[in-house]
């Protein structure tokens, strides 16, 4: 049976885009262990929890951002399937916007750093092809909403 995890692709919008036209910035966390990879907050589903409850709990635990500080974006839900630690794993992501651009990020011991990044930089740090694709799809979804 595949391990199941859920998370939120957290983003914020700059009121004034940077020179490279980056108006949307994604929050990535750097793991404290292994290859110190960068991902959005995510974690394993606990018994009795819904997938979205898991994503919200993990975001609070790993980044210190609680559900009241976020707006879940309707219509975007992506599922990744891959092998981690020699076991099949399924991870489900939703998009969530922080209500306060300057929200405080408080990392747990599971992570050693965080960064707010435009799409190109986020894709460079996200080492895994599937993670890059989800970030690109999320960005495209957000841009299509604004059009």
UniProtKB/Swiss-Prot annotation:
Residues 2-139 form the Nudix hydrolase domain. Coiled coil: none annotated. One of its GO terms (biological process) is ATP biosynthetic process. Divalent metal ions. InterPro entries: NUDIX_hydrolase-like_dom_sf, NUDIX_hydrolase_CS, NUDIX_hydrolase_dom, Nudix_hydrolase_domain, Tetra_PHTase. GO terms for molecular function: bis(5'-nucleosyl)-tetraphosphatase (asymmetrical) activity; GTP binding. It is an enzyme of class 3 (hydrolase). It catalyses: P(1),P(4)-bis(5'-guanosyl) tetraphosphate + H2O = GMP + GTP + 2 H(+); a 5'-end CoA-ribonucleoside in mRNA + H2O = a 5'-end phospho-adenosine-phospho-ribonucleoside in mRNA + (R)-4'-phosphopantetheine + 2 H(+); a 5'-end FAD-phospho-ribonucleoside in mRNA + H2O = a 5'-end phospho-adenosine-phospho-ribonucleoside in mRNA + FMN + 2 H(+). It comes from the Eukaryota. Inhibited by fluoride ions. A motif (Nudix box) lies at residues 43-64. Its cofactor is a divalent metal cation. SUPFAM superfamilies: Nudix. The modification N-acetylalanine is found at residue 2. It holds the Pfam family NUDIX. Its EC number is 3.6.1.17. Keywords: Acetylation, GTP-binding, Hydrolase, Nucleotide-binding. Belongs to the Nudix hydrolase family. Catalyzes the asymmetric hydrolysis of diadenosine 5',5'''-P1,P4-tetraphosphate (Ap4A) to yield AMP and ATP. Exhibits decapping activity towards FAD-capped RNAs and dpCoA-capped RNAs in vitro. This is Bis(5'-nucleosyl)-tetraphosphatase [asymmetrical]. It comes from Sus scrofa (Pig). The lineage of its organism: Eukaryota, Metazoa, Chordata, Craniata, Vertebrata. The gene is NUDT2.
